[in-house]
Amino acid sequence: MHDLFIYGTLMPGLRLEAEMHGAERLGPARVPGRLVDVGHYPGLLHGEGTVTGEVYRVSDAQLARLDEVEEMVPGDRPASQYWREQVTVLEGALAGQPVWTYVYNQPVDGLTPIAHGDYRRYIREVGRDS
């Protein structure tokens, strides 16, 4: 089993929530980093700030499926839209523990920062569906 931090369209009530079917929700959390608006989903980047999301426990098979959803090509970082990395939870579920998350792995020039790091709040503010 793997602990995974999600922060965008995989969260409950958002567009890709069905991809999390069968995963165990551990609760809300915050991790270090910053968010950008990639178009119809966010991208987490390394940097100052915090990102709001949720932690789930997933099986090996679920994690492999989520790698596909996030367009992560194992062993080929340059070809991957996101890259799965470990981060340490700052607050909330599993605080102080390492968890997997998907870090955006493409150029970010021209992308809009999501300064507060909360994708749910952001889509409400800009009036966008997930």
Q: What residue ranges belong to the model's regions?
A:
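Glycine-aromatic micro-motifs
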Residues: M1-S130
